[in-house]
């Protein structure tokens, strides 16, 4: 599909400096000054209203803002290959419906190659979405400038170009909305190797999206020598998810302090990390645990917290010997 949209050709339409739309008094002045014949004036008003309607409904600033927010969210999502029998719809897969034997039938080398194809397809799709959204922004700016022209005559003279531009922008919007949903992966080669008399199942590959894992910045807090971390996923999966939590001390000052780091598997959305150094900055990252079907994960959330200062020297026992020990406990909250 060609997403190129031709320009409006505003260079052929002379625009004066922008000003506000004609109000009722200015309309009467325009008619009194005989800028246009009455019928031509009515045509101008009808066409300008149609253009205004398009810009306030199909291409409104609020709608474009929502699309930009969705685009930013897609850049943070994780993308997976879903293997489905042809009679199942995307989202129906679970251990009961999709037996693990399906993976046992698939050639591992071919599947790894398809994961690379899936990653490339996802990257291209995100780039195309960004390009389409940029075209929508630019198109709205062009049409806004045309509406602000104080002289109706060039507007009427260039109406054919305006109509073409409206059709082009509608097509761009349709393409953008269609591409927001990950599509099917096209298989050039059989994924299932020859297994003799065994009946080969009919399968298809789809790209699916999982919402990003993000820290709860209000609930994640640092104490003197420990932190309480919380995170969430906007849309919870039907099956409980596993996460990978990483932490490290920023700007360690000794070799022993370099041991203040770790990778922790977590089966919940909350965790406490203890035996940290007081009055120091730590960086934390969270993501889903590695999955065999993951093809692209461009982003992971990170959070920096600063532990509170400890008591004055001499009032607390020495922490020597504890620097390399990083006891971690799941949160009870």
Swiss-Prot record:
Residues 307-333 are annotated as: Disordered. This is Fibronectin type III domain-containing protein 11. The gene is FNDC11. Residues 212-310 form the Fibronectin type-III domain. Pfam families: DUF5581, DUF5581_N. InterPro entries: DUF5581_C (IPR048317), DUF5581_N (IPR049231), FN3_dom (IPR003961), FN3_sf (IPR036116), FNDC11 (IPR039581). It comes from the Eukaryota.
